[in-house]
Amino acid sequence: MKNTLYLFMCLITTLCLAQSKEYNSAVVKINKYVEGTLVTPYSDDSVPLIIFIMDAGAINRDGNDRMSKNDTFKHLAYELAKSGIATYRYDKRLFKMDGLGIREHEISLDHFIEDAISVIEFFKKNKKYKKISIAGHGQGSLIGMIAAKGRANSFISIAGNAMPLDQVIIEQIAKQAPGLDKSAAVAFEQLKKSGRATEYDPALESIFRYDLQPFMRSWLQYNPSEEIVELEIPILIMYGDKDLQVETAQAEKLKEVVPQADFLFVQNMNHILKEIKGGRLDNHKSYNEPFRKIMPEIISGITNFVKQ
């Protein structure tokens, strides 16, 4: 009886271990600027790979900044692995700039594009994956569009803007602080023409901070609606109606310029792909609640798109 019980317990333990090992996770360093985590499902066959590019700011590979912890892309990577999809997610260069001795005024959006391209080229040389898809979140959507051109097999825009940065910010200011939008418009024109904005309301200092202006100017060179139409690969556009950072109008505008793209609009989903049943307070709280699950529509939507 004891032997039978022992064998039974061994079998249960083996099954549990097998279930927990649905994927392998490893740190992969591309170069001194780019380091991330590769999550690969256990499979005898070649699997597709998704490269995630994070949103604006000092965001790490899991989707967190220094003020919040939601682990969105960590959870998403594990869920996609269960569906037979490998993922690579990496820290934004801003997240590790102090350790690299990089100053804020030295950072350009082009650096982020270079980082994304270096990741794509690294995995293309590997020749291990069935196909490579790029998925950009927020600002990462624009970066991904540019990097994917001529390099990736498909592109996924997650809560990305359709309009150039200055238009997005001016519209937001007009709604939140009417009157200041005119000052912002003048400052953006100065920044684009002369490289420096000097005439703006002091209330806009956080936007037009001196050391931030070179980065802003580099970002202003790109228009998402112009970049995405140059892609000759399958496109998936994803948004949620509880997004406090990117308005639903951006989704419609992006859809207009690439009508052939697949489009997924998720009810009650916020910017970090979590379900929000309450109001703004519940939405803000979710940014520090890593236990919240990713919306299932996102997992199935990405899986179906990548595997088609």
Q: Can you say where each PLM-predicted feature lies in the sequence?
A:
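Short beta-strand/loop motif that positions the catalytic acidic residue
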Residues: 231, 237-239
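Catalytic active-site module of serine/aspartate enzymes centered on a nucleophile-bearing elbow/loop
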Residues: 272-273, 278-308
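Conserved alpha/beta-hydrolase
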Residues: 72-99
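N-terminal cap/lid segment of alpha/beta-hydrolase-fold proteins
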Residues: 19-45
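Short alpha-helix in the alpha/beta-hydrolase fold that links the catalytic acid
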Residues: 233, 246-257
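Short, surface-exposed "cap/lid" segments of acyl-processing enzymes
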Residues: 43-80
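Alpha/beta-hydrolase active-site loop
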Residues: 104-126
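Accessory cap/linker subdomain of secreted extracellular hydrolases
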Residues: 154-226
